């Protein structure tokens, strides 16, 4: 009887922890979409040019600079909060509090009339959100006690992130029509308020309860020592680390550029707000979740190595379909096919590459190592989104997406070398 009760308690704890990861992922997806879709869409409606819209994406630069402050999150304990709630939860609370303050400030401006102030506040929001992401990434790696739990943690986080993107897109579009943009941002703030409550409800990972941290600000020497040890540890386990990083940098190019330029393209092709909300966002999210779930099943059967290759190849179909759509013009059937292909590829490749990132990290420097790896992926997305806006201004849409496809193919020869020499993929046979 006692064993059954203990088993039920463990099930409840696991259930709470996974739901918590899902909700935090939702907040992360919501704030991410605020920068990459909501504000760009509002600016598109106001007839701003693609180069200005693409430049707003630079406000998300903190997402690719997580490595700069991840050593502090690994080694520095915030007085009172970390001792009271645990190392990871203490940092999560701080990031949530400042995120809420930044979101509150965003309510007092009109992005269309205050571009510079908008960019500054979005930069602050992305800094807070990326800090939360560092903590969440470490939490979902440290908390699981088995390979199956690791897969579930990333799956729930991925689903939550995409639900947040749905709220930040479909919810944004409909709310802006019915209630106006100010109500949209008020709703986003209200959802963000859930974050601190979730953090208080989940448990601190056991591995962090005995983690060697300090309440004194680490000096520059200690700071760089943490980064150095993190990189050396990665390099010791993963030969030719720079080649792997370059591969990661290019891997998401076929997805990041179409995502950033989708709003201007769809508006240029005269798709209505209703069509974009229902087909591109609502239907697209469902397909993305299917792609992510299938990648987990495939990884369990074929291993991470082959799943990553499949994900990278099928991603090339995404810009190709946008090229076809841009050539044909307004056509609902082609639009649905394009959305299906893009979102399935994004869900599949996005989930499997995240699991691969986690497999590269060791327990001592989880936050720093994962940030180092993920930063290069984010760098690809953010820089290419910004440059994509400039290129789209001078190229026709079909030529633009053809160039996107050709550029994205550069990952193939790099992956081929990795495949031939088995570089980096120490866990080729690892099943997750």
From Swiss-Prot:
GO terms for cellular component: plasma membrane. The keyword Electron transport does not apply. Keywords: Cell inner membrane, Cell membrane, Membrane, Transmembrane, Transmembrane helix, Transport. It comes from the Bacteria. It is a multi-pass membrane protein. The chain crosses the membrane at residues 17-37, 52-72, 90-110, 115-135, 150-170, 177-197, 241-261, 285-305, 308-328, 335-355, 372-392, 395-415. InterPro entries: AmpG_permease/AT-1 (IPR004752), MFS (IPR011701), MFS_trans_sf (IPR036259). It is found in: Cell inner membrane. PANTHER family: MAJOR FACILITATOR SUPERFAMILY DOMAIN-CONTAINING PROTEIN 3, SOLUTE CARRIER FAMILY 33 ACETYL-COA TRANSPORTER -RELATED. Belongs to the major facilitator superfamily. This is Putative transporter AmpG 3. The lineage of its organism: Bacteria, Pseudomonadati, Pseudomonadota, Alphaproteobacteria, Rickettsiales. The gene is ampG3.
